[in-house]
A protein has these predicted regions:
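N-terminal intrinsically disordered, low-complexity tails
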Residues: 10-45
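Glycine-rich phosphate-binding loops of nucleotide-dependent enzymes
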Residues: 2-5, 14, 32, 37, ...
């Protein structure tokens, strides 16, 4: 877990436990909220603010959720590097000599038409696929041959295009599960509930409560995941990913199925995550959202990088326009401002469901 304990409300903090003790709740309040393995019909709905009134202070929540600030790294330095990465499935080359980096403290958008290789690149970074050639370097060390849980421990967390939650567990329990990657307690320690295990569990619950408040679902901490709205399930998945204390948060189409108001709210959350000290990789089909929230965009087409730059640079690049509209550069030049059938059709990826290339 992070070494910082702002406000003294972590496992070893005095103020938070004093507040709970004064109301006669102390650790029992955590037990009421978090009972792994318990068979409950439908737990009572409890707002985080009822258990931890301190978390009504957004500055305190931001401090609890922020990554470990004892790590000294400059914003703008490469955090993850794709170095000449090729991923091949039999005769199909899904990624072809792909090179780009993700810099500390930025929101990077990864876009491209269906089948461009976005999901393959995403999976190569997070350990689902191993590169056929080249390497993925994260925080100075190659990670391409590591097992997925080791990559998570190194500091890469992800969400999924299709929501993957533990539906019969509460929102709080789902987030606490995410913190398991940072636990140091042995299996015997957990079985016999040693002081170290209890301390780590208290830490995990406290931070999970802060994360739920941070993403906007603090009022639903004890609701089962299956009972949450679609938008809240998306936010819960982000909270669970943040519970692993990542250096890099990878979001796979987080706005899929959202209405315009929900997308605006999501954009605010993604910026908030970046501003709190995280680095974010975003795959998303909604170009308005991508352009509005990212600091830089990398564009893939047929498994190759065709553009890398600021949102304004990328969206005005003739190669990118041609890739999205499906017309040659020469036709775009000859028909600038025109309204031919391809131009009227708009980007082929709007409303798409993901890469054709897995």
């Amino acid at each position: 877990m992070s070494t910082h304990d702002p406000g003294g409300i972590g496992a070893g903090g005095e103020h938070g436990d004093e507040h709970l003790a004064s109301s006669g709740r102390a650790d029992s309040s955590r037990a009421d909220l978090y009972m792994p393995g318990a068979v409950l019909e439908e737990p009572a709905i409890v707002d985080v603010a009822e258990v931890r009134p301190e978390l009504a202070n957004p500055d305190l929540v931001d401090a609890m959720v922020a990554p470990d600030r004892t790590v000294h790294a400059k914003v703008g330095e490469p955090l993850l590097q794709m170095q000449n990465v090729t991923v091949q499935f039999g005769g199909l080359v899904a990624l072809n000599d792909v090179t780009f980096d993700i810099r500390r403290g930025e929101i990077l958008g990864l876009i491209g038409p269906n089948g461009a290789g976005k999901t393959t690149a995403f999976n190569a970074m997070t350990g689902v696929y191993r590169p056929t050639q080249g390497q993925v370097v994260f925080d100075g060390s190659p990670v391409g041959k590591l097992k997925r849980y080791r990559i998570t421990q190194r500091g890469i967390a992800r969400t999924f295009q299709n929501i993957r939650l533990f539906n019969e567990m509460t929102a709080l329990e789902n987030v606490v599960v995410g913190s398991d990657a940072r636990h140091r307690t042995s299996v015997p320690g957990a079985l016999f509930r040693t002081p170290r295990h209890r301390r780590e569990e208290r830490d995990a619950i406290d931070r999970a409560l802060a994360l739920l408040e941070f993403v906007g679902v603090g009022g639903r901490a004890t609701e089962k995941a299956r009972n949450l709205s679609y938008g809240d399930q998306r936010r819960l998945e982000i909270a669970r990913a943040l519970a692993t204390e990542p250096k890099l948060l990878c979001l796979d189409e987080p706005a899929a199925g959202f209405n315009p108001a929900e997308k605006e709210s999501l954009m605010d959350l993604i910026r908030h995550i970046r501003d709190d000290g995280y680095t974010v990789l975003l795959i998303e089909h909604d170009m308005r959202l991508v352009r509005g929230v990212t600091d830089r965009i990398v564009v893939l087409e047929f498994g190759r990088v065709i553009a890398d730059g600021t949102p304004d640079e990328v969206t005005s690049d003739p190669k990118v326009i041609a890739a999205y509209l499906g017309v040659p550069d020469s036709e775009l030049t000859a028909d600038e401002g025109g309204t031919g059938p391809d131009r009227a059709a708009g980007p082929t990826t709007e409303g798409g469901s993901g890469d054709a290339t897995a």
